[in-house]
Design a protein with these regions (language model features):
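Cytosolic linker/terminal segments flanking nucleotidyl-cyclase catalytic modules
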Residues: 1-113
Length: 113
């Protein structure tokens, strides 16, 4: 389980949840590869993740056009309400890759209900 801003990422169940103003959580539906891109970036928060690294991690042993990474990052940003020009979650590193810049925490398993 990973927490960042108003979001809770549950890799085990492949779910993304957003906490609203009332404290209630709403599930955000993501396609499997979109979830995989988000999960990889969150898992490696704070460091540069290259395009090649994302391709190898999310599409192992598969030939995928390089633009696929960009399309899925756009989908992740849309789900998070992030903007590339003024990012709070995903920073684009031109010609290199992406960096997840929001603080991420992993709560104690016993404290998660």
């Amino acid at each position: 389980m990973k927490l960042f801003a108003a979001f809770r990422l549950d890799p085990l169940n492949q779910c993304l949840w957003r906490r609203g103003d009332t404290g209630l959580e709403a599930r955000i539906l993501l396609a499997p590869k979109t979830f995989a891109v988000l999960a990889y970036l969150v898992e490696h928060a704070g460091r540069l993740v290259t395009h090649e690294e994302l391709l190898e991690a999310v599409w192992p042993d598969t030939v995928v056009e390089p633009q696929a990474v960009k399309r899925y990052v756009v989908a992740v940003r849309s789900a998070l309400g992030d903007r590339p020009k003024n990012p709070i979650f995903i920073e684009t590193m031109p010609k290199r890759g992406y960096r997840f810049i929001a603080p991420v925490s992993a709560p104690d398993r016993k404290s998660v209900v």
